[in-house]
Curated annotation (Swiss-Prot):
Family to which the UniProt record says this protein belongs: Belongs to the G-protein coupled receptor 3 family.
Gene name linked to the record: GRM6
GO CC field: dendrite; endoplasmic reticulum membrane; Golgi membrane; plasma membrane
Oligomer and partners: Homodimer. Interacts with GPR179. Interacts with photoreceptor synaptic protein LRIT1 (via its N-terminal extracellular domain).
Keyword Signal: yes
Topological category with respect to the lipid bilayer: Multi-pass membrane protein
Topological domain spans for side Cytoplasmic: 600-613, 665-688, 762-774, 837-868
Protein name: Metabotropic glutamate receptor 6
Pfam families for the chain: 7tm_3, ANF_receptor, NCD3G
Signal peptide interval: 1-20
Residues carrying a glycan: 287, 442, 470, 558
Organism in which the protein naturally occurs: Oryctolagus cuniculus
């Protein structure tokens, strides 16, 4: 296979002598090859296009300048002169390959095995012998990575070392495929790392990439994507490739695609300067000036040509360029070049015409008045603008790297020998490669020049930003804002942006979540998320997690943490406590007045007729009902909670037991009187008291058993007022009584109340002589209404934020109202008569015979029901 390839290359070398003639030749003992993009890529089938003044001519002249200096240095390669064969690649890899075949012609002919003897001319004339081609020992170039790759595949077959001054594709670091390739510029893998560091330093996490088709653009983007994936925190929205031969409207489509992900404002661009310029033009046409945030590779660097007349679109662009310096010696050399002293450069005349916008010779036809004739006296830098091209330093360093390697090789193989010794004729490429990889010297800019095992130079970059000057983009320029050498040093404060000059614009898939929000990641896109509020009682633990606060805590207003839930209770000063306390105080005062009046007039007919014993029991129950209000408002504690359990139902039980006993006695007397004159049993005062206290004892025994089974204590209930809005949440300090326990505590007395009401209904037909039957009935009816109203109010506020206040107030007011009804209907009228109408407090005449005969006489010693 190798023999077949060599035969093919030999044939191509023989077929391309004409094209190879367009070159710069310098005679020398050792010849270096050079590849430079003197012309741009041609259009419409042409191999070469317009002259490239800076990238082509400047770089080619830099090699000539370096060779002059090496040959003039008596300490470097003494007695050995370096020659050169410099070729134009026309910025096209296939054309460069054809040109590079001239570098291997001598080697191919050396392997020709007597092919020349087989050449016969017509008539037996011997063939003309052409001058033998130079034996190229090393090659400087090429510029574009695609060209270097194409040429490297050929040079390695003939063991010719190659050093590039501008090719940065990571692919060229593969020493198994490009083992004879080296470069004095760092590979794009370093550049890609620097660009990833820049993106991260700016806080961007969502960017798109844009690459020119070819090794440089595609390899650079691939390296950026891989490094960003390994580093994490940066996602690629889109990776767009610009075709090698873009069609009309292609760049408008590129901008349209970039706008499909408008949040990815950061655009990582690995493209040639022509593509960069057309991307900027399409951006302006789409009226998107200021939207995209460009991060350009070294192909953009600090060049003015891509941004000329497009400065407003380029403002804010961050670009990267291998660390370099302007070489003053080259400036002096180049600005003194003229048509007279630079005849060795066959393209210099074309450069002269292009640079000074003139013509050296007039055409045979009608002359163009707009183009003047060159005088030859023009001066570079005086009659035309001049700025040293950015890769000049690296061209000089590449030449010196080969020179230093040859010098070391000469010292090792030809010690004490001036000129070339037989050991270096011919020069072995593999041995030279070893010396090239071992060189270490200070280059033209004073920075160290060296190579690693893959032939790569260390990564050292300057970081630029294109900034407006005094608010004018057209007068702006590139400013150094940082450096990168294994680590990024970026002066963020020196950056300027459109809009707010000092605020870094975002390039993020999703905006940062606010306080109290967590990131809900989008599946498959680690840099995109939705912000989800930590609502309710949840708080933000970290950027991805919400958790519920402990039960005794509630979230802070911004849901970034938890804080203790306030504890509340019904206090003496609370507005909710005022109405029940007022009713209780008035009720106690009224009850005390009634009791005092009854005691003072204990033997008067009205007091005796009301049933003194049960009246005092009933009044005691009413007093206890009013007193419960103070227990319900008091601060909960073990003693208060125990007292609440005991007295909450005791007062009502005592009252309703007494009323039930009374109504039952009246009903039994009335029913018994219908059948006989014999009085019913258990209607004496003692019997009535025994029945009342027996009924009450059931409540007391039940409460005592409850106290023993579940000792009372206070609790803080955080669920009672755990409202939807955490800001309204409260912990309620209360006794350990649930709503059902409270109803259970009152349930027995309510049962007595219902039973009493039933007897009151049954006794509604009792004759007027039993003057308490109807008041008791009205009392029970009203009490039932009060408690029926209590139930929906009490349980209907279970979810209210004011539950503790409403329920306590409702309960105490209901108790006080029921007590007031009993007091008002049964005893206030009697007290009024006793105090204000004593003349009515006398025993009336005996009942009529008819009435008396139908009602059993009370037992001896009992209080009687006197007629009105």
């Amino acid at each position: 296979m190798a023999r077949l390839l060599l035969a093919l290359l030999a044939w191509l070398a023989q077929m391309s002598p004409v094209r190879a003639a367009g070159s710069v030749r310098l005679a020398g003992g050792l010849t270096l090859g050079g590849l430079f993009p003197v012309h741009a890529r041609g259009a419409a089938g042409r191999a070469c296009g317009q002259l490239k003044k800076e990238q082509g001519v400047h770089r080619l002249e830099a090699m000539l300048y370096a060779l002059d200096r090496v040959n003039a240095d008596p300490e470097l390669l003494p007695g050995v002169r370096l020659g050169a064969r410099l070729l134009d690649t026309c910025s096209r890899d296939t054309y460069a390959l054809e040109q590079a075949l001239s570098f291997v012609q001598a080697l191919i002919r050396g392997r020709g095995d007597g092919d020349e003897a087989a050449v016969r001319c017509p008539g037996g004339v011997p063939p003309l012998r052409a001058a033998p081609p130079e034996r190229v020992v090393a090659v400087v170039g090429a510029s574009a990575s695609s060209v270097s790759i194409m040429v490297a595949n050929v040079l390695r077959l003939f063991a010719i070392p190659q050093i590039s001054y501008a090719s940065t594709a990571p692919e060229l670091s593969d020493s198994t495929r490009y083992d004879f390739f080296s470069r004095v510029v760092p590979p794009d893998s370093y550049q890609a790392q620097a660009m990833v560091d820049i993106v991260r330093a700016l806080g961007w996490n969502y960017v798109s990439t844009l690459a020119s088709e070819g090794n440089y653009g595609e390899s650079g983007v691939e390296a950026f994507v891989q490094i960003s994936r390994e580093a994490g925190g940066v996602c690629i929205a889109q990776s767009i490739k610009i075709p090698r031969e873009p069609k009309p409207g292609e760049f408008n489509k590129v901008i349209k695609r970039l706008m499909e992900t408008p949040n990815a404002r950061g655009i990582i661009i690995f493209a040639n300067e022509d593509d960069i310029r057309r991307v900027l033009e399409a951006t302006r046409q789409a009226n998107l000036t200021g939207h995209f945030l460009w991060v350009g590779s070294d192909s953009w660097g600090s060049k003015t040509s891509p941004v000329l007349s497009l400065e407003d679109v380029a403002v804010g662009a961050i670009t990267i360029l291998p660390k370099r310096a302007s070489i003053d010696g080259f400036d002096q050399y180049f600005m003194t070049r003229s048509l007279e002293n630079n005849r060795r450069n066959i393209w210099f005349a074309e450069f002269w015409e292009e640079n000074f916008n003139c013509k050296l010779t007039s055409s045979g036809g009608q002359s163009d008045e707009a183009t003047r004739k060159c005088t030859g006296e023009e001066r570079i830098g005086q009659d035309s603008a001049y700025e040293q091209e950015g890769k000049v330093q690296f061209v000089i360093d590449a030449v010196y790297a080969i020179a230093h390697a040859l010098h070391s090789m000469h010292q090792a193989l030809c010690p004490g020998y001036t000129g070339l010794c037989p050991a270096m004729e011919p020069t072995d490429g593999r041995t030279l490669l070893q010396y090239i990889r071992a060189v270490r010297f200070n280059g033209s800019a004073g920075t160290p020049v060296m190579f690693n095992e893959n032939g790569d130079a260390p990564g050292r970059y300057d970081i630029f930003q294109y900034q407006a000057t005094n608010g004018s983009a057209s007068s702006g320029g590139y400013q150094v804002v940082g450096q990168w050498a294994e680590a990024l040093r970026l002066d963020v404060e020196a950056l300027q942006w459109s809009g707010d000059p000092h605020e870094v614009p975002p390039s993020q898939c999703s905006l940062p979540c606010g306080p109290g929000e967590r990131k809900k990641m989008v599946k498959g896109v680690p840099c995109c998320w939705h912000c989800e509020a930590c609502d309710g009682y949840r708080f933000q633990v970290d950027e991805f997690t919400c958790e519920a606060c402990p039960r005794d805590m509630r979230p802070t207003p911004n849901h970034t943490g938890c804080r203790p839930t306030p504890v509340v209770r019904l206090t003496w000063s609370s507005p909710w406590a005022a109405p029940p306390l007022l009713l209780a105080v008035l009720g106690i005062m009224a009850t005390t007045t009634v009791v005092g009046t009854f005691v003072r007039h204990n033997n008067t007919p009205i007091v005796r007729a009301s049933g003194r014993e049960l009246s005092y029991v009933l009044l005691t129950g009413i007093f206890l009902i009013y007193a419960v209000t103070f227990l319900m408002v008091a601060e909960p504690g073990a003693a208060v909670c125990a007292t609440r359990r005991l007295f909450l139902g005791l007062g009502t039980t005592l009252s309703y037991s007494a009323l039930l006993t009374k109504t039952n006695r009246i009903y039994r007397i009335f029913e018994q009187g219908k059948r006989s004159v014999t009085p019913p049993p258990f209607i004496s005062p003692t019997s009535q008291l025994v029945i009342t206290f027996s009924l009450t004892s059931l409540q007391v025994v039940g409460v005592i058993a409850w106290l023993g089974a579940q000792p009372p204590h206070s609790v803080i209930d955080y669920e009672e007022q755990r409202t939807v809005d955490p800001e309204q949440a409260r912990g309620v300090l209360k006794c350990d009584m649930s709503d059902l326990s409270l109803i259970g505590c009152l349930g027995y007395s309510l049962l007595l109340m219902v039973t009493c009401t039933v007897y009151a209904i049954k006794a509604r037909g009792v004759p007027e002589t039993f003057n308490e039957a109807k008041p008791i009935g009205f009392t029970m009816y009203t009490t039932c209404i009060v408690w029926l109203a209590f139930v929906p109010i009490f349980f209907g506020t279970a979810q209210s934020a004011e539950k503790i206040y409403i329920q306590t107030t409702t309960l105490t007011v209901s108790l006080s109202l029921s007590a007031s009804v009993s007091l008002g209907m049964l005893y206030v009228p009697k007290t009024y008569v006793i105090l204000f109408h004593p003349e009515q407090n006398v025993q009336k005449r005996k009942r009529s015979l008819k009435t008396t005969s139908t009602v059993a006489a009370p037992p001896k010693g009992a209080d009687t029901e006197d007629p009105k």
